[in-house]
A protein has these predicted regions:
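Extracytoplasmic thiol/disulfide redox context detector
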Residues: 1-58, 128, 170-176
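Solvent-exposed, acidic/flexible segments
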Residues: 11-12, 16, 22-30, 53-60, ...
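Extracytoplasmic/secreted envelope proteins and their assembly/folding machinery
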Residues: 30-37, 60-64, 77, 94, ...
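Structural microenvironment flanking redox-active thiols in thiol-disulfide oxidoreductases
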Residues: 39-101
Length: 176
């Protein structure tokens, strides 16, 4: 069975990064992964999927989809990691995230309206379904082509997990 975040199209291979903004390992992996994404092969479609292991993860999960819905992932994704891990801001509720977004150029009302929208709720539900389908136990983690999974605990480091993902992408290209 294939588990995909979106329909990636014929000849394309999906790579999913499962993450959580408050995860220190995800924060440490983000610069490496962002660099990899910039150099990713043309046939690889990268999707970021925020996890929800517990109910209190939902606000950050929805925040990512607010950024995505408003075409602001490039502007806000790294900033949110920085605010949480470097500035030590507590950003785990909708009001706190909305106030932070407002200080970073996204009006609070627009953030909250989008946060509470049907579209963001649907994307958040789908993200949790993908997380469950891949049986994600921890983050960061990588899903390849809707059927392969790896993470740092399986490979000892996220650098190796990325190498495994590259190998699996090659296997998918070869039809395996």
């Amino acid at each position: 069975m294939l588990f995909r975040s979106t329909d990636v199209g014929a000849g394309k291979i999906e790579l999913i990064e499962f993450f959580w903004y408050s995860c220190p390992h995800c924060n440490a992996f983000e610069p490496q992964f962002a660099a990899w994404v910039k150099a990713a092969p043309k046939d690889v479609v990268v999707q970021r999927v925020p996890v929800r292991f517990r109910d209190d993860f939902e606000a950050q999960q929805r925040a990512y989809y607010v950024f995505e819905s408003l075409n602001m992932v490039d502007a806000m994704h790294g900033k949110l990691f920085h605010a949480i891990h470097t500035e030590r801001q507590q950003l785990s509720t909708a009001p706190a995230l909305a106030a932070w977004a407002n200080k970073n150029g996204l009006p609070e009302k627009k953030f909250l309206d989008t946060f509470n929208s049907f579209g963001v709720a649907t994307k958040a539900r789908r993200a949790t379904q993908l997380q469950d389908a891949f049986k994600v136990q921890g983050v960061p983690a990588l899903g390849v082509a809707g059927r392969f999974y790896t993470d740092g605990s399986l490979t000892q480091t996220m650098d190796r997990a990325l190498q495994v993902a590259e190998y699996l992408i090659g296997e998918v290209r070869r039809g395996r």
